[in-house]
């Protein structure tokens, strides 16, 4: 089990680091971010598919196709400025939507798609089914699509190299929290954190995860980001502490949120895609939880600028 876990984790890390390096050194068509479209869709749609499957297993009626399509619309809409650049023109700086505005437009469009599908498929002999499918499809879009859209927003922050360094830092810090919590809990975990949801998680593990996340945050802010992006202002003293803490804390919330759905569905893992790790959602759960708080911390200047 541990061998499979280490193998799958190592393979994922190597593949992701390769794509991030290519995006940094050899951007496709000279446009930063294009290399990451593939993994973005893979992880977003894989997570949405596993969530839909677990909702069905828990006894819910689900519009999986609407949820997946809406998730793709939301995740890709934030890339519109990138697609603009691929057409050979700079994204207009005076565009009223800016970059964040596309998230709002895409979210409304995705939810409308889910709703219209049920308007077309409504059957009065199956009362309640359409409403349940609308609610489940909306949940999939909001829970998966929005955080992945925020990850794209992090990639687009500041100068291209700075945004990429910020995204790498967010992933490294959040996954360091996962690793610290797992191994600290295995070694010295005694007091259960939330036994009714996840019996394996302990307070000792949570503290170990937070500690390692803060350390990883410090190393990223004083080493990785300056090396990649040459920021105009360095990270403040409070930056690594706040960033590491929020990534670890809300990463755990994302983990426990998945545990709740798995409990409802009677499943141990979200899938079997990754030996030793489980499904794709078992990998993205903490990133989904940490995406928005990490973005807000970066906007507040936790990593400098």
Residue ranges and their predicted role:
Residues 216, 220, 292-298:
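Hydrophobic alpha-helical transmembrane segments that constitute the membrane-spanning cores
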Residues 246-251, 275:
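Transmembrane alpha-helix interface/packing and boundary motifs in multi-pass membrane proteins
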Residues 264-287:
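Interfacial loop-to-transmembrane junctions
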Residues 182-185, 262, 290:
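Generic transmembrane alpha-helix signature in multi-pass membrane proteins
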């Amino acid at each position: 089990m541990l061998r499979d876990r280490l193998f799958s984790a190592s393979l994922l890390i190597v593949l992701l680091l390769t794509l991030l390096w290519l995006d940094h050194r050899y951007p496709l068509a000279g446009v930063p971010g294009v290399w990451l479209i593939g993994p973005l869709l893979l992880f977003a749609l894989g997570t949405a598919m596993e969530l839909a499957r677990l909702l069905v297993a828990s006894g819910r009626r689900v519009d999986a196709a609407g949820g997946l399509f809406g998730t793709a619309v939301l995740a890709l809409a934030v890339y519109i400025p990138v697609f603009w650049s691929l057409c050979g023109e700079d994204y207009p700086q005076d565009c009223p939507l800016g970059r964040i505005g596309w998230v709002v437009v895409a979210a409304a469009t995705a939810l409308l798609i889910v709703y219209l599908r049920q308007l077309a498929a409504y059957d009065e002999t199956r009362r309640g089914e359409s409403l349940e499918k609308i609610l489940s499809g909306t949940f999939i879009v909001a829970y998966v699509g929005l955080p992945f859209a925020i990850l794209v927003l992090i990639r687009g922050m500041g100068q291209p190299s700075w945004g990429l360094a910020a995204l790498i830092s967010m992933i490294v810090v959040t996954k360091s929290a996962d690793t610290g919590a797992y191994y600290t809990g295995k070694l010295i975990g005694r007091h259960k954190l939330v036994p009714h949801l996840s019996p394996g998680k302990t307070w000792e593990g949570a503290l170990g995860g937070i500690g390692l996340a803060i350390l990883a945050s410090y190393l990223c802010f004083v080493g990785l980001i300056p090396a990649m992006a040459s920021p105009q202002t360095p990270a403040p003293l409070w930056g690594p502490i706040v960033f590491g803490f929020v990534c670890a804390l809300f990463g755990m919330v994302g983990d426990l949120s998945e545990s709740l759905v798995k409990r409802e569905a009677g499943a141990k893992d979200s899938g079997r895609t990754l030996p030793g790790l489980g499904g794709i959602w078992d990998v993205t759960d903490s990133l989904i939880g940490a995406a928005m708080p990490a973005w807000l911390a970066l906007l507040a200047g936790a990593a400098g600028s």
